[in-house]
Amino acid sequence: MTKRKKKTTFERLSGMNRQQRKELQRRLYSGDPGLEVVHPDAAGIDIGNDSHFVAVAPSRDEQPVREFGSWTAELEKMAEWLKACGIRTVAMQSTGVYWFAVQDTLERHGLEVFLVNARHTRNLPGRKTDVQESQWLLKLHTYGLLRNSFRPPEEIRKLRNIWRLRDRHVGESARAVQHIQKALISMNVRLANAISDISGTSGMAIIRAMLRGERDPIKLAALRDRRVRATEKEVALSLEGVWQDDHLFELEQAVDMYDFQQKLLAGCDRKLESYLAALPAREIAAADKQAPPEEEPVVTGESTDSKKRKRKRNKGKRTSGNAPKSFDLRAELKRVCGVDLTRVDGLDVMVVQTVIAEVGPDLGSRFASEGHFTSWLRACPRPDISGGKVIRQTREPSSGRIMKGLRMAASSLLRSDSHLGARYRHLRMRLGAPKAIKAMARQLACIIYRLLTKGHAFVDAGAEQFELKRKERELARLKARANSMGLQVVPIPA
């Protein structure tokens, strides 16, 4: 069989008729890549701190690229100019926080805004200027080559902003506790060795008494709560230190910072409660409620044994110490979601609230399937296909807040006597801890998607069922391997 010779450019041109050559010449001179125009009324904006560059098609205005300032009045002029040019949709990169005001202004004027990832809009090397960047965004958006980023509704965005702000205050409180512990250790006051949480009731009572001038270890140890495991004598021994004025001042400053952060946390909790109360109660339509497959741990209906396991598990399930204490967050989340996501092993109110604050409870209208949802979370590898074959599977970094919470929830399943706990231990033994944690985080994301879209009631199938099915699969593999070698697996008589 002779190898087919590749035609040169001149040979391909000679094979064209007159009409084909004219069409090729028109495309070359006009810069038309031959793609289908998806958004004819499009514009591109290069977002900046001091100014924004806006590009429209040359046929829309004599000056197709204009620069507008970042003032509110300039943003209004930008929106009016785009409407005068007949623009309906605009593409811009999500650069820092500079795009917030631009998007709000354009949407208020009735323009559709495509917020795109900057990694998906890279231009050719050497063409990184503000004008060329806006024109490049215009060209990509005109031919429908950009993917709009997910942005939840306004009420969910408000909830997300408060929850993220609260998370920062929690981090600042933790740093204040570290400064408190540093000041105590500097005076050789080893309170943390006797009391695990110095920011708790006993720890703060003792520390505040120190700041009021009390130095007697016996009197300070008497302030401990009776639930503290360490004896009063052990606590008193840990409070014998070298009292120094500079370290006491450092301790006072750290306690003031901790109290200030706790005050800010209380304000965030009140705002969070009002935003959650404003969200409507969600009821999943009866048509969407479907019975899940039997092999999944999400099932409808409960047996007597599963009820006993659930009561035993919920009894020992602690609420996170950083959860709001001024209202019942679990009850509010159940009302907003329509299902109780905290019944899933590993998920507490903090993880569930993070999921709801980031994407909202209505996942079905935003993500077509659980595969789309986990892909958006970067919880699954991205296959690179060439020649009809998967040549590699790239794992993108998943540093989002939802995946952080799900990974923490997955790692807490190590000692869980449940179906998910047994599966995590099995994967941990096979793949190692990092891969097992990410795999279980993806499974938790799939369970959340099913619960929020189908209205399943979560009932733990139990670790025994997982082990039973695992042994059945292993036995089936052994039989298949024995048959391939002409052998037979014979059970040992009891």
Show the residue positions of the predicted features:
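A detector of single, family-specific signature residues
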Residues: 1-494
